[in-house]
């Protein structure tokens, strides 16, 4: 059975929506033809998505273990075929990483603010620039990934670690002031890793934040309007 990796974000006993929950409110029309093709091929989308999520979890875990110098990520609960595929993808990551000068700062860092929560995959110094990274095992780099990264950047500047003391909070804030760019690093099943980098000061990053902000407003509005159900 594949482990449920959804994390709950709590502030003063109040559950906060996650960044991915908020972005899920946005329609993704590009998924409709894909789902149709998968259905015509007889693929069970529930099983496919569970496998995709499981593979991503293992790869994330192995990258975290690598940067934190753990002995090994425990993937024993996952199917053998998935473990073998994750080894292949992790090998691709190592090849990608070997071509860059990367120093790890934080990994898998759960953050919260008064509006939402989210877990930052990695904050590193990459080729001399402090970079906020999100690892993806998806087939493509989708635009909303940068909305996700803009939310994580907001959390670094205005939020705090969900766990830890004031010293850690101070460290994260100080590093947040030095972040120069965000990057999506795609490690696909087929093909080699691809990275897309956007500077914090760019128009593209501004648009990414506007996209997330609009998604957050829509998420909150949907919660409110759902209360207007017809009386029984």
Predicted segments with their positions:
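Short, Lys/Arg-enriched, disordered terminal segments
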Residues: 1, 231-232
